[in-house]
A protein has these predicted regions:
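Residue-level detector of Asp-centered blade-edge/turn motifs that repeat once per structural unit
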Residues: 118-121, 170-172, 220-222, 270-273, ...
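Conserved beta-propeller blade signature
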Residues: 43-46, 124-125, 175-177, 225-227, ...
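C-terminal segment of N-terminal export signals and the immediately downstream linker at the start
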Residues: 4, 25-51
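Short glycine/acidic-enriched loop and turn motifs that connect beta-strands
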Residues: 51-55, 130-134, 181-185, 231-235, ...
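Beta-propeller fold detector
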Residues: 96-103, 150-157, 201-207, 248-256, ...
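Short loop/turn segments that connect beta-strands within beta-propeller blades
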Residues: 90-93, 144-148, 194-197, 242-246, ...
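Repeated scaffold domains used in trafficking and secretory/extracellular systems
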Residues: 107-116, 160-168, 210-217, 260-268, ...
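N-terminal secretory signal peptides and thylakoid transit peptides that target proteins
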Residues: 1-18
Length: 316
């Protein structure tokens, strides 16, 4: 690549505007010399936790964020430094660390990225749920808006054993997600998330099955919503969500190279052309990879390895 941004230039971009604006700049400018063979991949951004791998990294300084109590919202402002989160562009491999000192998880907790999406205005949003390995009460799910400044809200309306995940920024500007038990098991609720307070509210009466896990939300340009149902052995079914139907509409069993997909999906997104894309790996295989998904047959085609926890499509 002939036009590569320096660390200083990338850092200036990230601080001057939103994180996604910097990534969009990388996509539109730095990739102009080497467009992807598959245009659907150009705007895919991944997120993971841990140390940065590449040399192109920028650290966003400490910012003020507002946390809201999970049961009684308040206006208490505290200094929180979101760290341990790394953004990465699929097509360039360029990475960006979000902070560098205080972790989102406390000592004795493991940071679980339970949701990642892009809002209609381009702001990236991540849901994190610290998992405790001690007997103390774990920190509830947080949603962090990766803008300038970074803002973090504690999700309110969750029960002690619940977490919010599978975030989706809808075409009409809302933020929705799936609520289930912290171990990923039913019952599952489709909820709307207040962008100002973090409060959740149920938005429809779709009844999800009690013997399958539900994960991921994707909306295509035509407004159709998709998710996946995962059976006991990891068998994964693509389904459509229709507010006029009481149950999810089963479309197809997912498979790759003629083999039944057996490990659920990390992410499901829809490109501007209406192509469903999935992130995941078959059981006992690494790393994760991005796959195209045929909505009718369930056939998945491996496009590119991408060793991240979740993906979204950055919006300009």
């Amino acid at each position: 690549m002939n036009s590569k941004l320096s660390r200083r230039q990338f850092g200036q971009l990230a601080i001057a505007g939103t994180v996604v604006s910097g990534l969009s700049y990388l996509t539109n400018k730095a990739l102009a010399q080497i467009p992807s063979l598959n245009p659907s991949l150009n705007n895919i951004v991944g997120i993971t936790s841990g140390s940065i791998i590449t040399t192109d990294k920028a650290v966003i300084p400490e910012v003020n964020t507002t946390e809201l109590d999970s049961t009684a919202p308040n206006n208490l402002s505290t200094d929180i430094k979101p760290v341990g989160l790394v953004l990465q562009s699929l097509t360039t491999g360029n990475s960006q660390v979000l902070a560098n000192s205080t972790p989102l998880a406390e000592p004795g907790e493991i940071l679980n990225i339970s949701g990642f999406t892009s809002l209609s205005d381009g702001t990236l949003v991540v849901a994190t749920t610290p998992v405790t390995i001690s007997r103390k009460l774990a920190t509830p799910t947080r949603i962090t808006f990766l803008g300038t400044p970074i803002k973090t809200l504690i999700v309110s309306g969750l029960k002690q054993n619940q977490q919010l995940g599978s975030l989706l920024g809808t075409n009409d500007g809302r933020l929705i997600g799936l609520v289930g038990k912290k171990n990923g098991t039913p019952p599952i609720l489709l909820v709307d998330i207040n962008l100002q307070t973090g409060e959740i509210s149920s938005i429809n009466k779709i009844k999800f099955p009690n013997d399958e896990r539900v994960s991921n939300l994707a909306e295509c340009p035509d407004g159709k919503l998709y998710t996946s149902l995962v059976g006991f052995h990891g068998d994964t079914t693509l389904v459509q969500l229709d507010s006029n139907q009481k149950k999810p509409i089963r479309l197809a069993q997912l498979k790759v190279d003629g083999k039944e997909w057996n490990n659920g999906l990390q992410s499901l997104v829809c490109s501007a052309t209406g192509q469903l894309l999935a992130l995941g790996a078959m059981r006992y295989e690494t790393p994760n990879a991005v796959y195209s998904v045929d909505k009718n047959s369930g056939n998945m085609t491996r496009l590119q390895d991408f060793d991240v926890a979740q993906i979204t499509i950055a919006r300009r």
